[in-house]
UniProtKB/Swiss-Prot annotation:
Organism per entry: Mycobacterium avium (strain 104)
Gene3D superfamilies xref list: Vaccinia Virus protein VP39 (3.40.50.150)
EC annotation from Swiss-Prot or TrEMBL: 2.1.1.-
One Gene Ontology biological process: methylation
Similarity comment: Belongs to the UPF0677 family.
Disulfide linkage: none
Amino acids binding S-adenosyl-L-methionine: 129, 158-159
GO MF annotation terms: methyltransferase activity
Protein name: Putative S-adenosyl-L-methionine-dependent methyltransferase MAV_4435
Record key words, sorted: Methyltransferase, S-adenosyl-L-methionine, Transferase
S-adenosyl-L-methionine in keyword set: yes
Superkingdom in the source lineage: Bacteria
Pfam families tied to this protein: LCM (PF04072)
Length: 303
C-alpha cells in the first residue's frame, strides 16, 4: 500500500483502516482484567465499519496462527494503545479541569472522547478528519443513539488542506485557550506537512493553549519504513490479512520538542515506556521490535 500526497480514504482503507485497528485495540483494552481505559463505543464502531478481521477480533473470534507469539504481539498492541489513549484522555480532562473549554481533536478517526469523557458545562469539542470518516462516525453514533457529552462540532477536511479556515468557519474562537491533540498522526503526514501542522496550531492558539502529541526521535526515512514493516508484520502474526505497510511518509523530520519550543511552547516529553509504568502495565523490555520503542509522548503549553 503506497501513499501519495493527495490520497484519501475511508475507515476500511489505507490510513483509515489503522483508525479501525486502533479502535479495535481500544475495545480489547476496555474489557481486560484491569482496564486503564473505558471506551464503550469502540467495539460497536469497529463492527459498523465491517472489516472482517477487526470485527472478529473485537468479538473474540481470532486465533493467531502462532498462538504464543501472536498472542504476545496482540497484548503488546493492545497495551500500547491503552497507554496512548489514557495519556490523551488525561490530557483533555486535565485541561478542562484547569478551565479550558475549547478542544480540537485532529485526525479524530473513531475517537469517541466527545461522547465518553466527563466534559464540563460549556465545553466545545471539534473533530477534524476526512469527509468520509466524519460522515461515517456521525451516522453510526446517531444509529447507536449516542449523545455527545460536550458540544460537538465536526470539521470535514483533509489536514493537508486549509483546515484552519474550515475550523474557524465552524465557530472556532482564536481568542480562547484551546487543548489540541495530534494522536497517532505525525507519521502519516509528509515531513513538511508536520511542520505546517504545528505552525497552524500555533497561529490558532491563544496564550495558555495546550497541545498533546507523540513522535519518534529517530524518525528518518529508512527507520520509518522499517518500522512500518514491523508494524505490519506484528499484525500479520495476529492474523490480520490487511496490508498496513507503506502508510508512513519517509523523509527527515523536525524534532518535535525543538520545533515547538522554538515557537513559544513550553514542552515536556516522556518516553512511552515511562507511561507504561505510570499506568501499571509491564513494558516488554526484551522485545526488540516492540511498537515504536523510542516513541515520546509530548505535552506543551503556549506562552
Amino acid at each position: 500500500m503506497t501513499r501519495t500526497d493527495q490520497d484519501s480514504w475511508d475507515l476500511a482503507s489505507s490510513v483509515g483502516a489503522t483508525a479501525t485497528m486502533v479502535a479495535a485495540a481500544r475495545a480489547l483494552a476496555s474489557t481486560g482484567e484491569r482496564p486503564i481505559i473505558n471506551d464503550p463505543f469502540a467495539a460497536p464502531l469497529v463492527r459498523a465499519v465491517g472489516l472482517d478481521f477487526f470485527r472478529r477480533l473485537v468479538d473474540g473470534e481470532v486465533a493467531p496462527a502462532d498462538p504464543q507469539r501472536g498472542e504476545r504481539d496482540l497484548q503488546l498492541e493492545t497495551d500500547s494503545i491503552a497507554v496512548r489513549t489514557r495519556f490523551f484522555d488525561d490530557f483533555f480532562t486535565g485541561a478542562a479541569r484547569d478551565g479550558i473549554r475549547q478542544s480540537v481533536i485532529l485526525a479524530a478517526g473513531l475517537d469517541a472522547r466527545a461522547y465518553r469523557l466527563d466534559w464540563p458545562a460549556g465545553a466545545v469539542v471539534y473533530e477534524v478528519d476526512q469527509p468520509k470518516v466524519v460522515e461515517f462516525k456521525t451516522n453510526t453514533m446517531a444509529a447507536l443513539d449516542a449523545r455527545p457529552a460536550a458540544q460537538l462540532r465536526t470539521v470535514s477536511i483533509d489536514l493537508r488542506e486549509d483546515w484552519p479556515e474550515a475550523l474557524r468557519a465552524n465557530g472556532f474562537d482564536v481568542t480562547q485557550a484551546t487543548s489540541w491533540s495530534a494522536e497517532g498522526l505525525l507519521m502519516y503526514l509528509p515531513p513538511e506537512a508536520q511542520d505546517r501542522l504545528f505552525d497552524n496550531i500555533t497561529a490558532l492558539s491563544a496564550p495558555g493553549s495546550r497541545l498533546a502529541t507523540e513522535y519518534h526521535p529517530d524518525a528518518t526515512g529508512t527507520t520509518m519504513a522499517q518500522r512500518a514493516q514491523e508494524f505490519n508484520d506484528r499484525w500479520a502474526r495476529v492474523g490480520c490479512d490487511i496490508d498496513l505497510s507503506g502508510l508512513f511518509f519517509d523523509g527527515e523530520r523536525s524534532n518535535v520538542v525543538e520545533y515547538l519550543t522554538g515557537r513559544g511552547w513550553r514542552v515536556s516529553a516522556r518516553p512511552r515506556r515511562d507511561l507504561f509504568d505510570d499506568y501499571g502495565l509491564a513494558y516488554p523490555e526484551d522485545d526488540e521490535t516492540a511498537q515504536f520503542p523510542n516513541i515520546v509522548a509530548v505535552s506543551a503549553e503556549l506562552g
